[in-house]
Amino acid sequence: MLREILDVLQDDPSSQRRWFHDDYFDLFVRQTAGELAAFELCYGIHSSERALVWSAGRGYFHDGDPLEADPIIGRFERASYGLPEVLRLALSARLREYILRKAEVPARRTRFRRAAWQQTGGKQNPKDQSRIS
């Protein structure tokens, strides 16, 4: 089950970054006024790590090898049971939308790279490095 990592560096007073983690997923979200504004759902292990990225106004991107959406999303929905309900429902809606639009979603790059704040527990200065902006 995903657990929240606390003390994540906050770089924008108008929004909140949050980080949830388990043994398979890292979920990075940005919320504005409590609403989901962006997320990165990172999954896989080490060299095979991939990410599904969404942000309002930009839409979806997928980093890494092509996504077999149904098993990943099913696994995520089981892991997300402990997330705050409003966030869990918003993420679930976005993931279902992704499944419906999958053919239209471009890949940004073939290998996923984390931003500095996502590698260190969020305590470094992420200026100009965060993909969730």
Enumerate the language-model features and the residues they cover.
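Intrinsically disordered, low-complexity regions
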Residues: R3, Q16-R17, A69-I73
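Amphipathic, interaction-prone secondary-structure segments
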Residues: D11-A51
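Generic preference for hydrophobic/aromatic residues in regular secondary structure cores
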Residues: M1-L2, R18-F20, L27, G59-F61
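Short N-terminal edge-element motif at the start of the domain
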Residues: M1-S14
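Mixed-charge, Lys/Arg-enriched low-complexity segments
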Residues: S55-K127, I132
